[in-house]
């Protein structure tokens, strides 16, 4: 992101409004740098932000074009960790095999398949289902940067762990990863409904 001059063209180009500037209150150094806010929608990898970038800070390429981060389950916010029945993140995930359920019907994210599109975070109902508990602000599943410590944790993390280990998932289209654009790591291309 060193090439980013914070011109805002990627923000204007995003048809879903998920590319937003890092707020000053969140990070003084990264202030104004493009980041992803999945409360507005999810990314379908249309690459309009990449096309609009005049500096090449966002670029096609790399072994995995579709990689915005990785989803992490927040166990004290995820409804499935307290009650059975919520499978919204798994049901809505457009990448086959990225989210499965464990023996207790709780979501498990498989980082090797997850592309960080944010659909799971967008549709997660935990904040509204837990409105009675003011201590729960987080979604039950959130997208973090692959380089963050939270992404390196195995299984689910707590809200405290997430807050201390979360790194802003800055819009980045050229991160290294084991598989390529729209192709499931096992070889078949059943990963997306749109934009292959």
PLM features: what roles do these ranges have?
Residues 1-3, 23, 30-42, 51-196:
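Flanking helices and flexible, charged tails adjoining ferredoxin-like Fe-S electron-transfer domains
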Residues 1-12:
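Mature N-terminal segment immediately following signal peptide/propeptide cleavage
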Residues 15, 19, 24, 32, ...:
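Membrane-embedded segments
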């Amino acid at each position: 992101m060193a090439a980013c001059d914070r011109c805002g063209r990627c923000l204007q180009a995003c048809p879903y409004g998920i590319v937003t500037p890092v707020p000053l209150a969140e990070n003084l150094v990264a202030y104004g740098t493009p980041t992803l806010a999945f409360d507005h929608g999810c990314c379908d990898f249309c690459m309009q932000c990449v096309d609009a970038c005049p500096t090449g800070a966002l670029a096609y390429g790399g072994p995995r074009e579709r990689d915005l981060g990785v989803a992490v389950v927040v166990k004290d916010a995820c409804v499935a960790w307290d009650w059975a029945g919520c499978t919204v993140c798994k049901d809505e995930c457009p990448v086959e095999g990225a989210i499965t359920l464990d023996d207790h019907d709780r979501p498990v994210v498989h980082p090797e398949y997850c592309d960080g599109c944010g659909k799971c975070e967008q549709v997660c109902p935990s904040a509204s289902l837990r409105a009675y508990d003011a201590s729960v602000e987080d979604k039950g599943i959130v997208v973090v940067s692959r380089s963050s410590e939270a992404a390196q944790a195995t299984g689910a993390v707590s809200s405290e762990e997430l807050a201390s280990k979360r790194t802003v998932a800055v819009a980045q289209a050229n991160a290294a990863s084991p598989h390529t654009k729209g192709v499931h790591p096992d070889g078949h291309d059943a990963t997306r409904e749109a934009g292959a």
